C-alpha cells in the first residue's frame, strides 16, 4: 500500500520488519531490492537480490532484477550474462509464460541498446514480438531505435502501436513529433 502511495520509505521499513521475522521471505527481499534500486542504493539492492537468489536460485524476478541492476550500474557484460543465461535455461525448460519470456528479450535489447548494438537489439525485439505482441514496451524501444536510425516511418508506426496498446498518447507527444521532422 505504501508503495502505491509513493511512500517508499515506509514500505522499505515494513519489508525490513518482515525480513527481521522471516529472513528468507522472497517477496520482501524482492520488493526491498526494488525500492533500493529506485533510491539508487545499488549496493543494498544487490545484497537483497543476491540473498533472494540464495533462497531461490531460479527466481525469475530476482534474476531479472539483478540484470537490471547491473545495467543501471553500467555493468553491461554482467547484465548480458544474467539475461543470456535466463534465456538459454528458459528455452530448455519453458517454465515461463510467453509474456515473461518476451520480457527477457526486451531486457536484453535494452542492454544492447545501451551498448549501441542497435541491430542486435532489433533482433531481440523481433523475437519479443513473436513471443508476445501485446507488450507496449517492445514497440516503444523499437520505435526509439528506428528514430535514432532516422527510420521515421517505422518509428511512427511503432509509437502508434504502443498507443494502441495503452500508452497515453501525451506521453509520446515529443517522440511522435520527431517522426514528422
Enumerate the language-model features and the residues they cover.
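Terminal, low-structured helical/coil segments at or just beyond the last alpha-helical repeat
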Residues: 96-99, 144, 148-181
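Position-specific recognition of the canonical hydrophobic site in helix A of tetratricopeptide repeat
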Residues: 3, 30-37, 71, 106, ...
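Short, conserved structural micro-motifs that define repeat-unit consensus positions
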Residues: 22, 32, 52, 70, ...
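Structural signature of tandem alpha-helical TPR/SEL1-like repeats
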Residues: 5-17, 39-51, 73-90, 115-127, ...
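Helix-start (N-cap) detector for alpha-helical repeat units in TPR-like alpha-solenoids
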Residues: 26-27, 60-61, 94-103, 136-137, ...
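Structural marker of alpha-solenoid helical repeat scaffolds
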Residues: 21, 55, 89-97, 131, ...
Amino acid at each position: 500500500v505504501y508503495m502505491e502511495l509513493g511512500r517508499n520509505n515506509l514500505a522499505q521499513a515494513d519489508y525490513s520488519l518482515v525480513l527481521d521475522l522471516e529472513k528468507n521471505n522472497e517477496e520482501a527481499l524482492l520488493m526491498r531490492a526494488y525500492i533500493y534500486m529506485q533510491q539508487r542504493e545499488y549496493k543494498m539492492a544487490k545484497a537483497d537480490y543476491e540473498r533472494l537468489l540464495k533462497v531461490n536460485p531460479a527466481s525469475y524476478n530476482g534474476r531479472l532484477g539483478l540484470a537490471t541492476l547491473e545495467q543501471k550500474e553500467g555493468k553491461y557484460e554482467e547484465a548480458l550474462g544474467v539475461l543470456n543465461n535466463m534465456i538459454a535455461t528458459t528455452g530448455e525448460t519453458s517454465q515461463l509464460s510467453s509474456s515473461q519470456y518476451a520480457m527477457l528479450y526486451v531486457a536484453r535489447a535494452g542492454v544492447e541498446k545501451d551498448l549501441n548494438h542497435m541491430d542486435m537489439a532489433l533482433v531481440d525485439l523481433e523475437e519479443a514480438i513473436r513471443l508476445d505482441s501485446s507488450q507496449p514496451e517492445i514497440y516503444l524501444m523499437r520505435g526509439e531505435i528506428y528514430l535514432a536510425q532516422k527510420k521515421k516511418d517505422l518509428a511512427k508506426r511503432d509509437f502508434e502501436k504502443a498507443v494502441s496498446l495503452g500508452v497515453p498518447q501525451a506521453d509520446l507527444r515529443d517522440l511522435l513529433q520527431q517522426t514528422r521532422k
